[in-house]
């Protein structure tokens, strides 16, 4: 008796454990296809050894790799606390196997790489020569030419989360506060760090962006249909934050779609910052006309500022949540 595909899928779906599904995969070739698709369509890999093992399977068995649509790779400090003293870096085999596995997953749609581990920076080369077209990509890899080159090829990407973006260093705002000797020669000028950015026309479907600084917003928002932005100030200095805020709204105006959500993190939440933020929102009314969410705000509870707040909120006709 030959079971239909629908019945085989129901049997696999009601299996109690992955061990039972593995056993079903050995019953017949028909069950093998359904069971393997169920096992490998969504993979959540945590730990060095497990990641190496599964990625080696994907690299050596293209048939299995073709089932993978959602992949999460994570290694955290607490998982490797006992090994950290002996090896401060993840082994090269970890990165090689990850790269080989990723290059074999041609149907991948959602990828998350969270390697919260010392020495993880500058390993975005694992994304080189990958052929999949993602819808969602979350990573904490270092922002470099490899990561930017990968993003340049992601024509279907809609949701992007990055944890790293180089902080600019400007000669007009030196970080050193040490006094200079009167007769010492002036220090050489500090050159601004130029970060690689995706080329114009890339990421044509990007609509959700979560990034660590407003500088990343200026690199990724203009010309793209971004409707939801989550970012934060790069500094706690009030004057610098004002300049950042002005530049942020200039870049938000350059989005190809109306903004629906803006969440701006601040290391020092206070009412002055909130009111300044709302003033910028009001002055950028065309950009903010359709906004429904403004993140976490420190609202005034007494004084004259309480009466100023309604006049600002009046302009947000569609605002749903504001705490």
Regions found by a protein language model. Name each.
Residues 1-323:
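Leucine-rich repeat
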């Amino acid at each position: 008796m030959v079971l239909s595909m629908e019945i085989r899928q129901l049997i696999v779906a009601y299996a109690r454990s992955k061990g039972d599904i593995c056993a079903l995969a050995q019953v017949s070739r028909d069950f093998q296809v359904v069971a393997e698709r169920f096992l490998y369509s969504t993979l959540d890999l945590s730990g060095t050894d497990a990641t190496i093992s599964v990625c080696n399977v994907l690299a050596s068995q293209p048939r299995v790799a073709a089932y993978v649509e959602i992949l999460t790779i994570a290694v955290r400090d607490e998982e490797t606390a006992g090994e950290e003293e002996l090896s401060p870096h993840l082994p090269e085999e970890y990165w090689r196997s990850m790269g080989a596995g990723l290059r074999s997953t041609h149907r991948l749609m959602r990828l998350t790489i969270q390697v919260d581990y010392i020495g993880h920076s500058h390993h975005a080369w694992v994304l080189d020569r990958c052929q999949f077209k993602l819808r969602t990509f979350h990573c904490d890899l270092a922002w470099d030419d490899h990561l930017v080159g990968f993003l340049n090829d992601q024509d279907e990407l809609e949701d992007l989360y990055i944890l790293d973006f180089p902080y600019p260093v400007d000669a007009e705002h030196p970080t050193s506060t040490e006094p200079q000797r009167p007769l010492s020669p002036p220090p050489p000028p500090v050159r601004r760090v130029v970060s690689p950015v995706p080329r114009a026309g890339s990421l044509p479907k990007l609509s959700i962006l979560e990034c660590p600084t407003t500088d990343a917003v200026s690199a990724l928002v203009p010309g793209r249909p971004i409707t939801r932005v989550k970012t934060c100030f790069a500094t706690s200095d009030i004057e610098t934050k004002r300049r950042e805020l002005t530049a942020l709204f200039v870049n938000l105006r350059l989005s190809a779609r109306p903004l629906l959500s803006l969440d701006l993190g601040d290391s020092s939440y206070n009412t002055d910052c909130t009111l300044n933020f709302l003033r910028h929102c009001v002055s950028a009314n065309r950009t903010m006309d359709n906004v429904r969410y403004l993140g976490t705000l420190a609202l005034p509870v007494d004084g004259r500022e309480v009466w100023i707040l309604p006049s600002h909120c009046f302009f947000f006709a569609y605002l749903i949540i504001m705490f």
